[in-house]
């Protein structure tokens, strides 16, 4: 597992977290801790680059959900049928069909936008 970060600028400063390797029960704690450390250091808008992630397990799904909640803060009091619950602070990049399918099947695509490349994700902020 290799995790690196870069800074890019769109309308706001965006931290891109590049993840290389599988996200599963053996790697998720390390991965989540590294990303949470980035948030604790002041990063507010994140792109998780999953283009080099070959496998995303249920542990990885829980991690993404936790990061969504961390960046969202206090949950809104009501459900929003218009999709306003999508995260304005966390975007994903996934070019592998296997990982994209997991995002769709798990329903994470309802709360997290994902893009085909980092440039598109950064430009979405």
Language-model segment annotations:
Residues 112-117:
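Short acidic-hydrophobic, aromatic-tinged amphipathic segments that line or gate anion-handling sites
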Residues 25-111:
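Amphipathic alpha-helical interaction surfaces in cytosolic regulatory modules
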Residues 1-33, 50-55:
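STAS-typified acidic loop motif
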């Amino acid at each position: 597992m290799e995790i690196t970060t870069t800074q890019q600028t769109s309308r706001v400063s965006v931290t891109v977290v590049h993840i290389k390797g599988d996200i599963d029960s053996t790697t998720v704690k390390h991965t989540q801790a590294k990303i949470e450390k980035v948030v604790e250091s002041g990063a507010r808008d994140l792109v998780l680059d999953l283009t080099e992630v070959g496998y995303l397990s249920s542990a990885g799904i829980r991690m993404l959900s936790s990061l969504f909640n961390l960046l969202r803060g206090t949950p809104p009091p009501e459900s929003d049928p218009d999709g306003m619950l999508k995260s304005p602070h966390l975007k994903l990049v996934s070019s592998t069909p296997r990982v994209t399918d997991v995002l769709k099947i798990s329903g994470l695509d309802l709360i997290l936008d994902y893009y085909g490349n980092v440039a598109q994700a950064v430009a979405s902020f």
